Amino acid sequence: MNLINIAIDGPAAAGKSTIARRVAESHSMIYVDTGAMYRAITYKYLQEDKNDDFQALIEDVSLKLVYDEDKGQRVLLNGEDITDYLRSNEVTQNVSYVASKEPVRTFAVKVQQQLAAEKGIVMDGRDIGTVVLPDAELKIYMIASVEERAERRQKENEENGIPSSLNELKKEIEARDHYDMNREISPLRKADDAITVNTTGKSIEQVTDIISDLIDKVEA
C-alpha cells in the first residue's frame, strides 16, 4: 500500500477533528491536530497578556505533539503539557485572531509540513489542502449546518465542564466563519480538487465510512 497524506478542511465544529482522528486510527495513519497548535500559541499569547508582538512570541515557542496511548495526542508548549487548557472559552474566543497573524501562520505551517514529509498523515484545519499540503493525495472539505455545529460545540463544552448557551454558540460560529473566510492570510476555502462531505445528520461512523471509501479509491 502506498502511503498517502489526507487533508481535511472546513469551518469550526464541522466534525473535522473527530473524523480525522477516527480515519487515522482505522487506517493506521498518524493524526495531526493543527487546530491544537494554534490554540497552544493562543494560550501562550494569553499568558503574555495579549502582547501583539507575534514575531517575539513565536521566537519563544517550542511546540511538540506527543501521542499517549490512553489520552491520545497531547500538546507540549515549551515542555509543558497544556492540552487540557486548549478548549477554554478564552482560548476559543482568541484563536482566530492569533492564527491570522503572519508570523504565527508561517511558524505553524512549517511545523505541519515537516510532520507530513514522511506521508501517512491525516491533518485537519482551515488551509491544509490549499496551503499546508497542496499536494495531498486526498482532500476533503467538510461542512455541516450552523445549528448542528453549535450543538456539537455545546456538547463538547459540557464534556469539558464549560457552561455555554446554544444561541451564543451559533453567533460565535457564524462570526468565526466570516472571519476565517475573509482573513487576509490563508483564508478558509475549498481546494479546487477537494471533495465536499456534508456531515449534517450523519453519525461519526457514517462519515468515517464515506471517507474510507474515498481512501480506498485513491489507494487502488
UniProtKB/Swiss-Prot annotation:
It is found in: Cytoplasm. Keywords: ATP-binding, Cytoplasm, Kinase, Nucleotide-binding, Transferase. It catalyses: CMP + ATP = CDP + ADP; dCMP + ATP = dCDP + ADP. Residues 150-169 are annotated as: Disordered. GO terms for biological process: nucleobase-containing small molecule interconversion; pyrimidine nucleotide metabolic process. It comes from the Bacteria. One of its GO terms (cellular component) is cytosol. Its EC number is 2.7.4.25. It is an enzyme of class 2 (transferase). ATP binds at residues 10-18. Belongs to the cytidylate kinase family. Type 1 subfamily. PANTHER family: CYTIDYLATE KINASE, CYTIDYLATE KINASE/PANTOATE-BETA-ALANINE LIGASE. This is Cytidylate kinase.
